Curated annotation (Swiss-Prot):
Protein name listed in UniProt: Probable beta-galactosidase E
Lineage of the species this protein comes from: Eukaryota, Fungi, Dikarya, Ascomycota, Pezizomycotina
Keywords, sorted A to Z: Carbohydrate metabolism, Disulfide bond, Glycoprotein, Glycosidase, Hydrolase, Polysaccharide degradation, Secreted, Signal
Signal peptide: 1-19
Pfam family, one: Glyco_hydro_35
Disulfide partners: C267-C316
Protein species of origin: Aspergillus fumigatus (strain ATCC MYA-4609 / CBS 101355 / FGSC A1100 / Af293) (Neosartorya fumigata)
Binding residues for substrate: Y92, N136, A137, E138, N195, Y261, Y365
Length: 1011
């Protein structure tokens, strides 16, 4: 048996190491192909980054400040990411939102990054800045401003008119980022120019990048360098082909990174895991592409999204759930990833029409942190377990990944084991998963490995290990627990910490009912059980071996100064590892030299510090919650939670404990259907008296668009400066009596709709689908027209956002508006067209809320969606009880006050439903929801899927007056009413979060040039 075991271990190691050479430690700035560094605070070798000389695993979460337009809440999100055990955040900035007006980059109010940088520094998170200029990110046009779309040059090419268009924005953002670099005491440690720049039409993978593509990347890098950016640059190659890696020439970046989404996007079938993108050899790919830099994944799938007519983000959360996190994230660790960014960790909201047509208002993304900033999804806790393990495992950072081989180390071909071999350390790590990673079945196995006490097969005390369906585990050997050697453990490490008086506390966990085993050197005292039962302890050779079956009740053992907690995974979820503040310049940033506390504390613990004889904690609870200090670097006798001293006691094993009492607060929310609503017609354009003199005449006889127009003039909205929200066209003609039909081919993006009137006569609507970007149709005219009389078509089109694009395709330029038209009995030139979008187009007036927040509807052009419009002359009408009796657009407004209790985070949402009995609630209609001027919901009744629209505190005034407006667009002749609209609260959370200042909410005033 012993010889068979030796052969099995040797064979497994041979297979594993075959293509896994060890690298000698050297700094990449010494490599021949490495450019000279511009600073010395962020450096690297082939294994990892060094920040201020300390080797760090960069574990990052993606979070976009523009998707949460309340700067006072950014710190809350940062703290929740920090509490995951992450040490960084990656963020995009959206050029299209900041420079909607050419040459005018808005950087104040919600568009200022100052508070973002301050909050990151205070929370202790490094930042990876990604200013684009193209960002993708499910944003309209991928973040390219609408005015750039009408330029002749190909987007993302070296065309001079495109490159010059980026200059003002990149210079402005570059200076802002440069000021916030680590070299200036800020949090920014990496910068990414461009985004997923990896293809070009008619250029093969082997030919890419061409010189032109290299020039584009080099131009973006130079813009940043010229602005003062000195931290390393990084690329995110979504093809994983080595594009722009160090040493590749013009356009190369300092660090090479990839991005990948192996779980794909089928949120409608979330239990079916796709297999065709599951990676198996990334460690080799990286060695081929960039052997002198650490393996970096700059975007990895943290959720997914769906579109109009699809499913809600809940399905996306199931697709990339805690099981997927366990399997596919750990697969990445098997490749030795050392810079790891999860896209998204907090998604936020596509408010104000900022999204592309493939998504609805929510950008929850099924992420670990929900759109309304809650952390109840299990994958939040799973990510916390993983990040904290890697944080306390320096051996991982220099380990050499081997090959994952079916049957290696276990003899079970249904199981794949991927080793990571100690490279300068004695620690080896073994990642175990199903050979079929999608398997939902369970497998039994024994693990045969080499340790410092010889070759062993785990478990040694009988039984077998088990791997449940869609699971993956770290097994470790000769793992350093602050000077104590953990010879092996089949249970996973959550964390370990240094306590007072040279004590070490180790936390292990496993799944319910699993058999696990660990071993300690025999020179330690025999482990004793000080809490719990049913633990088997035996001496095997030169080791103490401990075996147990995971249960809800924890076990605690001691072996001299080493204390081991054996937890059920779901109990480990309730534990938090909090870094204590250090001296500058580390302060709240992560560092392997920092002291930590481990506290069992329920829903969320945010921060900790020790003063005198007290441990101060900030955190959140949603039920009465016991606190227990599992480990701390010094002894203290009191616990202060959110500024309140708690009654503390000592547990049987000597841990300090206390209880945070939770009392649900009394909450009073308005009944929206009982409020006094005011109404104004928002489609006066179909009245006989309407004068469109102030509208934009569509007289351009040319376009730079890749799609040629067919009429005498171009009708594309982008060519006239209108880029989002909604569009209204008016086509004037004089009748000749031969009119019987009109043909219209309209474009609004997937999910769009349109309605058409001839004078005051409703001709019908296209109500939209989850597939059509455009819709051509012939419309019969209902009656004969009077020859010689003037007529006008009014066409309302919903603008769902521009597309994203692969480089060079110019897909984002595909026009919105009327593409083609014809009128029977007439030449095309007989119709004279005008249009409007948002008031002023690119010269938009509400700089506070950005260029896309408004559309073409009359009430929006007048600014009536802003607080305190002149409603005294409007009639009273309720959109929920009364609504519209015919096709058209109504605008409804009301106000209410809130007075929610201090000290609680109370997520609020507006919820639409069509459960009312009135027939008109089941017709096709669309609503926009404006809250204190911000458009925070686009509701499509018959298409969906979104019915619930979270609105954060700071947009809603939790202690003050709120102005809410709803546009109601009835697409059918019988009209529409809103079946139901409620303001609802999620469970109030007793919170240590910082109450946010309201986002800027400038109110209504008469608008210059409004029509």
């Amino acid at each position: 048996m012993k010889s068979l075991l030796k052969r099995l271990i040797a064979l497994a190691a041979a297979y594993s190491v075959a293509a896994a050479p060890s690298f000698s430690h050297h700094s990449s700035q010494d490599a021949a192909n490495k450019r000279e560094l511009l600073q010395d605070l962020v450096t690297w070798d082939q294994h990892s980054l060094f920040v201020r000389g300390e080797r760090l695993m960069i574990f990052s979460g993606e979070f976009h400040p523009f998707r949460l337009p309340v700067p006072g809440l950014w710190f809350d999100v940062f703290q929740k990411i920090k509490s995951l055990g992450f040490n960084a955040v990656s963020f995009y900035t959206d050029w299209g939102l900041m420079e909607g007006n050419p040459g005018h980059v808005v950087t104040d109010g919600i568009w200022s990054l100052d508070e973002f940088f301050t909050a990151a520094r205070e929370a202790g998170l490094y930042l990876i800045a990604r200013p684009g200029p193209y960002i993708n990110a499910e944003t309209s046009a991928g973040g390219i401003p609408g005015w750039v779309l009408r330029r002749k040059g190909i987007i993302r090419s070296n065309s001079e008119d495109y490159l010059r268009a980026t200059d003002t924005y990149m210079a402005t953002l570059g200076k802002i980022i440069a000021k916030a670099q680590i070299t200036n005491g800020g949090p920014v440690i990496l910068v990414q120019p461009e985004n997923e720049y990896t293809t070009w039409p008619n250029v093969s993978e082997s030919e890419f990048p061409t010189t032109m593509n290299q020039e584009v990347m080099a131009y973006a890098e130079k813009q940043l360098r010229d602005a003062g950016v000195v931290v390393p640059t990084v690329v995110n190659d979504n093809k994983n082909l080595g594009y722009f890696a160090p040493g590749t020439g013009l356009g190369e970046t300092d660090l090479y990174g990839i991005d990948a989404y192996p779980m794909r996007y089928d949120c409608g079938n979330p239990y079916v895991w796709p297999t065709y993108r599951f990676p198996r050899d990334w460690q080799h790919e990286h060695r081929n592409h960039s052997p002198t830099t650490p393996f970096a994944i700059m975007e990895f799938q943290g959720g997914s999204g769906d579109g109009w007519g699809g499913v809600t983000e809940d399905g996306c959360a199931i697709l990339v759930n805690n099981e997927a996190v366990r399997v596919v994230y750990k697969n990445n660790y098997g490749f030795g990833v050392r810079v790891f960014n999860i896209y998204m960790t907090y998604g936020g909201t596509n408010w104000g029409n900022l999204g592309y047509y493939g998504g609805y208002t929510s950008y929850d993304y099924g992420a670990a942190i929900t759109e309304d900033r809650q952390i109840w999804r299990e994958k939040y806790s799973e990510e916390k377990l993983q990040a904290n393990f890697l944080k306390v495992s320096p051996a991982y950072l220099t380990s050499t990944p081997g090959n994952g081989v079916n049957g290696s180390y276990t003899g079970n071909k249904d199981i794949t084991v991927t080793p990571l071999f100690g490279n300068g350390t004695t620690t080896n790590l073994y990642l175990v998963r199903h050979a079929d990673f999608t398997s939902t079945g369970s497998a039994q196995y024994n693990l045969s490995i080499s340790t410092s006490v010889g070759n062993v097969t785990i478990p040694q005390l009988g039984g077998s290990l088990s791997l449940n369906g869609r699971d993956s585990k770290f097994h470790i050997t000769d793992y350093d627990v602050g000077g104590f050697n953990l010879i092996y453990s089949s249970a996973e490490v959550f964390t370990w910490a240094k306590g007072d008086n040279k004590k070490r506390v180790l936390v292990l966990y496993g799944g319910a009912g699993e058999l696990h085993e660990f071993a300690l050197p025999k020179h330690l005292p025999r482990p004793t059980v000080v809490e719990g039962s049913y633990v088997k302890i035996a001496k095997q050779g030169s080791a103490w071996v401990v075996q147990w079956e995971v249960a809800a009740q924890r076990r605690v053992l001691r072996a001299g100064k080493l204390e081991i907690h054996l937890l059920w995974r779901n109990d480990a979820y309730q534990h938090w590892v909090l870094e204590l503040p250090a001296k500058q310049p580390i302060a709240n940033y992560s560092s392997p030299s920092k002291e930590t506390v481990i506290v069992k504390g329920g829903y969320l613990l945010r921060s900790a510090w020790i003063t005198d004889n007290d441990l101060h904690l900030t955190g959140d609870v949603n039920v009465t919650t016991p606190l227990e200090v599992i480990s701390a670097p010094k002894r203290f006798d009191g616990i202060v939670f959110n500024g309140q001293s708690l009654k503390s006691t000592r547990s049987k094993i000597g841990n300090l404990a206390a209880t945070v009492h939770y009392q649900p607060p009394a909450i009073s929310l308005p009944d929206l259907k009982r409020l006094d609503w005011k109404y104004i017609d928002s489609l006066p354009e179909i009245s006989t008296e309407y004068n469109d003199e102030g509208w934009t005449p569509l007289t351009n006889t040319y376009t730079n668009n890749t799609r040629e127009f067919t009429g005498p003039t171009c009708l594309y909205a982008d060519d006239y400066g209108y880029h989002g929200g909604s569009l209204i066209y008016r086509g004037h003609f004089t009748a000749n009596g031969d009119e019987s039909w009109v043909f219209l081919n309209t474009s609004g993006g997937v999910g769009f709709a349109n309605s058409v009137w001839l004078n005051q006569t409703f001709l019908g609507s296209w109500t939209g689908s989850g597939r059509n970007m455009t819709y051509p149709r012939n419309i019969s005219l209902p009656h004969e027209l009077s020859p010689g009389e003037p007529y006008v078509f009014t066409v309302v089109i919903d603008h769902m956002g521009q597309d994203e694009e692969a480089p060079g395709t110019d897909a984002i330029k595909f026009p919105r508006g009327i593409l083609d038209y014809a009128l029977s009995g007439h030449e095309l030139s007989d119709l004279r067209w005008k249009m409007t979008g948002n008031l002023g187009g690119e010269q938009y007036q509400d700089l506070t809320r950005g260029p896309l927040n408004e559309g073409a509807m009359y009430a929006e052009r007048q600014g009536y969606h802003l607080p305190s419009p002149p409603t005294s002359s409007w009639k009273s009408s309720n959109p929920i009880k009364e609504g519209l009796t015919g096709a058209g657009i109504g605008f409804y407004a009301t106000s209410f006050s809130l007075d929610l209790p201090e000290g609680y985070d109370i997520p609020l949402s507006f919820r639409f439903n069509n459960s009312a009995s009135a027939a008109r609630s089941g017709t096709s209609y669309r609503c926009q929801l404006f809250v204190n001027g911000y458009q925070f919901g686009k509701y499509v009744n018959d298409l969906g899927p979104q019915t619930k629209f979270p609105v954060p505190e700071g947009i809603l005034n939790y202690n003050g007056v709120n102005y809410v407006a709803v546009s109601l667009w009835a697409l059918e002749s019988q009209g529409a009413l809103i079946g139901g609209l409620d303001l609802v609260a999620s469970t109030p959370i007793l919170s240590g979060y910082r109450k946010p200042a309201p986002a800027p909410q400038p109110g209504w005033k008469p608008r210059r040039g409004a029509y």
